[in-house]
């Protein structure tokens, strides 16, 4: 039976996810939310979504599955908003946040006791590119798509999500939300701090050593590439996993 999928956030992740869902489920209706008119237009023109809105609450009651592909702070705010809306019975809400413990905690607090299912998730894929214009149906291929089950997640719900996302060609795995945040602090968040710190330090160094920029080559680019990522998004990620990241910094010392 055809379903209605609502993707809130039509950036690189959300738009690429829409393409993947369309690949295996062309009969599903995909609704999209984004504040940017340009992003909505691109998603519609490329056939990623069927309808678009800049009013988040307007499409939520129509959806069988709602996926929040937004910055962490906004994801949390929208989970709180969804708790007060008249949603379909048994609707699945999921997210794509880079940290999980805070999101899962809010979901369990606000969605408990309702006919709502929640599945925390983090697709371990991305790029320094951003926006719907950079969407790629193969973005998630062979990448880990991590689910962080909670008290609001049943085995049947997990299976439904895996079927829905089959067109992403990702590798699904399940892990506790807090353990997810500990592991990603080491292999994702802390490396980003190192890359950004190296870029900042090099900029100051180059003020007195003019050949610095000219000599910086492959090794330097490899180490600092991730520092190009969108700073607002990374500020949200780092602040939401602050204590665990501070532990990694202490370990590094």
Where are each of the predicted segments found?
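Interdomain hinge/lid region at the active-site interface
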Residues: 208-253
């Amino acid at each position: 039976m055809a379903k209605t999928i609502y993707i809130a956030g039509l950036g690189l992740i959300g738009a690429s996810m829409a393409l993947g869902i369309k690949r295996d489920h062309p009969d599903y209706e995909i609704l999209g939310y984004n504040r940017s008119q340009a992003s909505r237009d691109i998603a519609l023109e490329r056939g990623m979504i069927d309808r678009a809105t800049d009013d988040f609450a307007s499409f939520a009651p129509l959806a069988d599955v709602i996926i929040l592909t937004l910055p962490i702070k906004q994801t949390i705010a929208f989970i709180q908003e969804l708790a007060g809306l008249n949603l379909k019975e048994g609707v699945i809400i999921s997210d794509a946040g880079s940290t999980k413990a805070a999101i899962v905690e809010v979901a369990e607090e606000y969605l408990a006791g309702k006919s709502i299912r929640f599945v925390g998730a983090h697709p371990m894929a991305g790029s320094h590119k951003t926006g719907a214009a950079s969407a790629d149906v193969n973005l998630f291929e062979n990448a880990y798509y991590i689910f962080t089950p909670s008290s609001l997640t049943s085995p049947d719900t997990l299976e439904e999500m895996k079927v829905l996302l089959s067109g992403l060609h990702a590798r699904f795995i399940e892990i506790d939300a807090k353990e997810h945040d500990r592991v990603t602090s080491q292999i994702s968040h802390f490396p980003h701090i190192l890359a950004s710190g190296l870029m900042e330090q090099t900029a100051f160094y180059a003020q007195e050593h003019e050949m610095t920029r000219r000599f910086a080559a492959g090794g330097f680019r490899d180490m600092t590439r991730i520092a190009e990522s969108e700073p607002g998004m990374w500020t949200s990620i780092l602040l939401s996993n602050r204590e665990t990241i501070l532990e990694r910094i202490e370990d590094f010392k």
